[in-house]
């Protein structure tokens, strides 16, 4: 199994840099190593242990056929989250969180279907029969839907888990997941409340290098879970054939 986490790699990526001590959340105390120049330093041995713990759970979730929805709308996280989530074929939200994304999933699915129906209109020629004004309106709607929901177009049911970068910023996503008992995995910085999260990864959630490093471990574990599922399906098919 992969994911041998080197403390030096975490250090080089700046995963240990927390926030100013005056901005801290006291509930993060167990994960703080020390204070240096008015900044809290995260205990990377605890980070490594928490990554392993989270990865073990993530492998099981994806091996059972469920999706992990990645959520990160802050500037320094958007691109890396989109890239990493896409690499393991998982849905992600990097634009504004659509209110009711989880708690009103049926409505969100309708919006995604609207996107598909516009694409169908373009394929079957219906689009060409519309007036110039109607075409423009539909194109604008399609662009808006694509921007906000394009990355979750293949998510036909609620996710098995959420992976969040910065729980303070994504507090609405956190609340919706809690309401539906969907497990929350998150990078939690020293200014955030770890009590809201099922699988806490104490880490610098402001630097893109730190975010990329944590996500590389997480997506590697997801890949392993997917590979395990593929080989299980293959074995099942072989057994069925033999019978």
What are these regions (language model features)?
Residues 1-67, 73-74, 78-121, 132-135, ...:
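N-terminal cationic and glycine-rich segments that engage phosphates or anionic surfaces
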Residues 14, 70, 162, 214:
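Residue-level signature of catalytic and energy-coupling elements of molecular machines
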Residues 46, 197-208:
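Short beta-strand elements at the ligand-binding edges of bilobed clamshell
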Residues 68-69, 91-94, 183-187, 222:
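Short hydrophobic alpha-helical runs that function as membrane-insertion/retention elements
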Residues 74-77, 97-102, 168-170, 190-194, ...:
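Conserved nucleotide-binding/hydrolysis micro-motifs of P-loop NTPases
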Residues 119-161:
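Active-site rim loops that border cofactor/substrate pockets in soluble metabolic enzymes
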Residues 168-201:
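Nucleotide-binding motor/catalytic cores of P-loop/tubulin-like NTPases across gene-expression machines
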Residues 212-237:
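A charged, well-structured terminal subsegment
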């Amino acid at each position: 199994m992969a994911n041998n986490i080197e403390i030096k790699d975490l250090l080089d990526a700046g995963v240990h840099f927390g926030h100013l001590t005056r901005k801290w959340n006291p509930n993060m105390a167990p994960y703080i190593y020390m204070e240096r120049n008015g900044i809290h330093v995260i205990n990377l041995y605890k980070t490594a242990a928490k990554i392993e713990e989270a990865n073990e759970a993530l492998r099981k979730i994806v091996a059972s056929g469920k999706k992990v929805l990645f959520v990160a709308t802050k500037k320094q996280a958007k691109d890396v989250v989109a890239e990493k989530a896409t690499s393991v074929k998982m849905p992600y939200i990097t634009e504004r969180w659509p209110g009711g994304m989880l708690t009103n999933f049926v409505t969100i699915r309708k919006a995604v279907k609207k996107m598909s129906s516009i694409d169908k209109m373009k394929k079957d020629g219906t689009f060409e029969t519309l007036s110039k004004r109607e075409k423009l309106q539909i194109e604008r709607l399609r662009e808006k839907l694509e921007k906000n929901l394009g990355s979750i177009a293949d998510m036909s049911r609620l996710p098995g888990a959420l992976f969040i970068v910065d729980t303070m910023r994504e507090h609405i996503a956190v609340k919706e997941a809690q309401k539906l008992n969907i497990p929350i995995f998150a990078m939690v910085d020293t200014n955030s409340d770890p009590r809201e999260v099922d699988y806490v990864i104490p880490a610098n959630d402001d630097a893109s290098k730190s975010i990329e490093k944590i996500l590389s471990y997480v997506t590697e574990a997801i890949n392993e879970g997917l590979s395990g599922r593929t080989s299980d399906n293959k074995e099942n098919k072989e057994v069925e054939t033999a019978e």
